Amino acid sequence: MASKLVFIIIFLFIGCQKSNTQFIHNEIFQFNDIKFDTVSKKLISNVKIVTPDEIFISEFISKWFENKIKTNGFEGDLIVEIDKILMSEIKELNYFKYSIDVTINFKNYKKNNSSKTFSVSASEFGVIEGNFAIKDQENLKKNLIMKSIKNIHNKIAQSI
């Protein structure tokens, strides 16, 4: 009888444990270098950075700018302006929606008073429904932030 009781208790203990499985994992994005025909580059932010998500995207854009936006010219300046970052999230029971809109302006100034301006925007959103962990929400946010910058990266690479 005692062995049956131990077996039942072990079975209940194992069966009642909540799964720790994450539904959304961090994605890995690869960025190629983008080369501009300028001598210098500068990053300017026209948005107010307050929330942790805004801090994350600001730092991510700075790293992307420093590591993947390259200059290889003899004259001119590249000014990259973060023009807009809008984020919204809706949290309800068993439902989470996150959206992000980003606009970045690329201004290429030359000495002969010619300039080119590219205004590039990206919008992303994601939804989680059902049983999910807070880590899933954070992973969704980070993935969407990086995906929006990847879209901007691809659009500007095609434009120049």
Label each region the model flagged.
Residues 131-160:
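C-terminal/domain-edge helix-coil "capping" segments
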Residues 1-2:
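N-terminal secretory signal peptides that target proteins for export/translocation
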Residues 73-135:
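Surface-exposed short loop/turn segments
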Residues 26-27, 54, 133:
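Alpha-helix initiation/capping motif
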Residues 5-14:
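Sec-dependent N-terminal signal peptides
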Residues 16-32:
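Bacterial Sec signal peptide processing site at the extreme N-terminus
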Residues 61, 98-100, 144, 148:
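Hydrophobic alpha-helical membrane-association signature
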Residues 32-84:
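N-terminal segment of the mature soluble domain
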